[in-house]
Protein backbone atom coordinates (compact mmCIF):
# COMPACT_ATOMS: atom_id res chain seq x y z
CA UNK A 1 0.00 0.00 0.00
CA UNK A 2 1.21 3.50 -0.80
CA UNK A 3 -0.08 5.85 1.85
CA UNK A 4 -1.01 9.47 1.35
CA UNK A 5 -2.58 9.75 4.81
CA UNK A 6 -0.71 11.06 7.85
CA UNK A 7 0.03 8.26 10.30
CA UNK A 8 -0.83 5.59 7.69
CA UNK A 9 -4.20 4.37 9.04
CA UNK A 10 -4.81 1.52 6.58
CA UNK A 11 -8.59 1.82 6.81
CA UNK A 12 -8.35 5.41 5.55
CA UNK A 13 -5.84 4.96 2.70
CA UNK A 14 -7.77 5.02 -0.60
CA UNK A 15 -10.92 4.58 1.53
CA UNK A 16 -9.62 1.29 2.93
CA UNK A 17 -10.51 -1.24 0.20
CA UNK A 18 -8.29 -3.96 1.72
CA UNK A 19 -9.69 -3.57 5.23
CA UNK A 20 -12.72 -4.74 7.08
CA UNK A 21 -15.48 -2.19 7.46
CA UNK A 22 -15.26 -0.78 10.97
CA UNK A 23 -18.57 1.06 10.77
CA UNK A 24 -21.69 -0.47 12.25
CA UNK A 25 -25.30 -0.84 11.15
CA UNK A 26 -26.27 1.41 14.03
CA UNK A 27 -23.96 4.18 12.77
CA UNK A 28 -25.42 3.89 9.26
CA UNK A 29 -28.96 4.18 10.60
CA UNK A 30 -27.97 7.18 12.73
CA UNK A 31 -26.80 8.95 9.56
CA UNK A 32 -30.07 8.12 7.80
CA UNK A 33 -32.00 9.55 10.74
CA UNK A 34 -29.75 12.57 11.29
CA UNK A 35 -30.13 13.74 7.70
CA UNK A 36 -33.72 12.53 7.40
CA UNK A 37 -32.83 10.51 4.32
CA UNK A 38 -35.59 8.84 2.38
CA UNK A 39 -34.48 5.27 1.64
CA UNK A 40 -36.36 2.27 0.38
CA UNK A 41 -37.43 -0.52 2.71
CA UNK A 42 -34.99 -2.79 0.85
CA UNK A 43 -32.11 -0.39 1.58
CA UNK A 44 -33.25 -0.17 5.19
CA UNK A 45 -33.14 -3.99 5.46
CA UNK A 46 -29.64 -4.08 3.94
CA UNK A 47 -28.43 -1.54 6.51
CA UNK A 48 -29.39 -4.02 9.23
CA UNK A 49 -26.86 -6.60 7.98
CA UNK A 50 -23.47 -6.19 9.68
CA UNK A 51 -20.37 -6.33 7.51
CA UNK A 52 -17.44 -8.61 8.39
CA UNK A 53 -15.22 -6.96 11.00
CA UNK A 54 -12.11 -8.98 10.16
CA UNK A 55 -10.47 -9.90 6.87
CA UNK A 56 -8.52 -13.14 7.08
CA UNK A 57 -7.38 -13.43 3.47
CA UNK A 58 -5.51 -10.13 3.21
CA UNK A 59 -2.38 -8.68 4.73
CA UNK A 60 -1.82 -4.94 4.59
CA UNK A 61 1.74 -3.67 4.28
CA UNK A 62 2.49 0.02 3.89
CA UNK A 63 5.38 0.14 1.42
CA UNK A 64 5.48 3.87 0.90
CA UNK A 65 4.40 6.80 3.03
CA UNK A 66 5.32 10.31 4.08
CA UNK A 67 7.47 8.78 6.82
CA UNK A 68 9.31 6.58 4.29
CA UNK A 69 9.75 9.54 1.95
CA UNK A 70 11.26 11.61 4.77
CA UNK A 71 13.66 8.77 5.65
CA UNK A 72 14.77 8.49 2.03
CA UNK A 73 15.25 12.26 1.80
CA UNK A 74 17.33 12.19 4.98
CA UNK A 75 19.58 9.44 3.60
CA UNK A 76 19.99 11.29 0.30
CA UNK A 77 20.86 14.55 2.08
CA UNK A 78 23.41 12.89 4.37
CA UNK A 79 25.08 11.19 1.37
CA UNK A 80 25.49 14.62 -0.16
CA UNK A 81 27.13 15.99 2.97
CA UNK A 82 24.22 17.85 4.53
CA UNK A 83 23.71 18.07 8.27
CA UNK A 84 20.09 16.96 8.55
CA UNK A 85 17.50 18.05 11.06
CA UNK A 86 14.33 16.01 10.79
CA UNK A 87 11.46 18.23 11.94
CA UNK A 88 8.35 16.10 11.43
CA UNK A 89 6.56 13.70 9.15
CA UNK A 90 3.17 14.83 10.49
CA UNK A 91 3.02 18.45 9.40
CA UNK A 92 -0.68 19.26 9.44
CA UNK A 93 -1.61 22.93 9.34
CA UNK A 94 -2.34 25.91 7.12
CA UNK A 95 0.28 26.28 4.38
CA UNK A 96 0.85 29.89 5.49
CA UNK A 97 1.67 28.73 9.04
CA UNK A 98 4.04 26.06 7.75
CA UNK A 99 5.75 28.61 5.52
CA UNK A 100 6.21 31.03 8.42
CA UNK A 101 7.60 28.23 10.62
CA UNK A 102 10.01 26.92 7.98
CA UNK A 103 11.13 30.43 7.02
CA UNK A 104 11.92 31.20 10.67
CA UNK A 105 14.07 28.07 10.88
CA UNK A 106 15.89 28.99 7.67
CA UNK A 107 16.45 32.58 8.83
CA UNK A 108 17.79 31.48 12.20
CA UNK A 109 20.46 29.43 10.40
CA UNK A 110 21.25 31.79 7.52
CA UNK A 111 24.76 32.55 8.78
CA UNK A 112 25.75 28.91 9.10
CA UNK A 113 28.70 27.78 7.03
CA UNK A 114 27.48 24.18 7.18
CA UNK A 115 25.32 22.61 4.52
CA UNK A 116 22.00 22.20 6.32
CA UNK A 117 18.80 20.40 5.43
CA UNK A 118 15.60 20.73 7.43
CA UNK A 119 13.07 18.04 6.57
CA UNK A 120 9.33 18.20 7.12
CA UNK A 121 6.63 16.07 5.57
CA UNK A 122 2.91 16.06 5.94
CA UNK A 123 -0.03 17.89 4.51
CA UNK A 124 -0.87 21.55 4.51
CA UNK A 125 -4.16 23.18 3.58
CA UNK A 126 -5.25 26.52 2.18
CA UNK A 127 -8.62 28.07 2.93
CA UNK A 128 -9.41 30.27 -0.04
CA UNK A 129 -11.51 33.36 0.31
CA UNK A 130 -12.75 34.75 -2.97
CA UNK A 131 -10.97 33.85 -6.20
CA UNK A 132 -7.68 32.23 -5.32
CA UNK A 133 -4.81 31.38 -7.59
CA UNK A 134 -2.12 28.82 -6.90
CA UNK A 135 -2.21 26.13 -4.27
CA UNK A 136 -0.70 24.80 -1.07
CA UNK A 137 2.90 24.73 -2.26
CA UNK A 138 2.76 28.24 -3.66
CA UNK A 139 1.11 29.52 -0.47
CA UNK A 140 3.77 27.85 1.68
CA UNK A 141 6.59 29.31 -0.44
CA UNK A 142 5.17 32.83 -0.41
Model-derived regions: residue spans:
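Active-site histidine-anchored catalytic micro-motif
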Residues: 1-29, 33-39, 111-121, 126-142
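Accessory alpha-helical/coil subdomains and C-terminal extensions
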Residues: 14, 20-101, 108
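Short, hydrophobic/amphipathic alpha-helical packing segments
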Residues: 99-103, 141-142
Amino acid sequence: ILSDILGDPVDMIASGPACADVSTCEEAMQIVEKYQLSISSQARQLLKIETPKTVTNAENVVMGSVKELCRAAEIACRRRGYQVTFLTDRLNCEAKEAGTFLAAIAQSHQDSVKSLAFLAGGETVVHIRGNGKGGRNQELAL
